[in-house]
Amino acid sequence: MVNALPEVKRAVAEAQPAGADAAQLKSGTLGEGANMPIKVGQVEALFRYPVKSMGGERLEMAELGWHGLDGDRRLALRRLDNRGGFPWLTAGKLPELIRFTPRRKGEAAGSSLPTHVRTPEGEELPVFSQELAADLGRRSGSPVEMMHLNRGIFDEASISVITSATVDEIGRLAAERPDVRRFRPNILLSSLRSLPFEEDDWVGGALWFGDTDDAAAIGVTNRDERCSMVNLDPDSARPSAEVLKSIVRVRDNRAGVYGTVTRRGRLAVGQAVFFEPAAER
């Protein structure tokens, strides 16, 4: 990607010219057609999932590297008796897995990788222990082992984004309390336009996080095709089929977008987010 930060900075400087229409500022349309990135919103929340399919962490700040957020999905449970192309134990096979919570203890408190996992019953077991593997093997019905992969274990892409407007709309359609945790994104955006499924319009373009010279960026590659995990209540693991049905019904089973990292940097809650259409890059 061509470094678009000069354009981003100009967009920020010119975003509020004298006499600018307030509706344009609110909608984010100011600057369209002016060959510059457009401010689309800000980072509302950041999430990291140290162990694939287990509970996530809500962060105020995170480092974005070539393989996603630092520490995201670097650990996963491998099913030892599986010879297929996808050997990982996920909440699709064991819904209760989302109620397991990775934790850090002692000197590892500042590390991106967990040292322990808290079970739904409150027991804390070392992340690479035989005790944890035996517990999860018993629950899933097949032996498992914890694996550490430096580049992460992703189903589709290393970074995922969804807007709060999309989460709220799906909750309304499914008659369920909106809960972003069902969608397991890395980045939750609060968009200026507050339009559900606005993310679809970003495919093929780029998102920039902040307006500094070291701003991080991702290329938006495709819409996020959803699976039954969105049906699981993050606290109880109880399913509600209406969530996935609603996404299938109104959006061809897609909600949110995937991306690939094109510029490393730091992400932070409250950070301004700019969209750069493909034609302008």
Regions found by a protein language model. Give the residues of each.
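Metal-cofactor-dependent catalytic cores
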Residues: 25-281
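N-terminal amphipathic/basic-hydrophobic helices that include classical n-h-c signal peptides
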Residues: 1-35
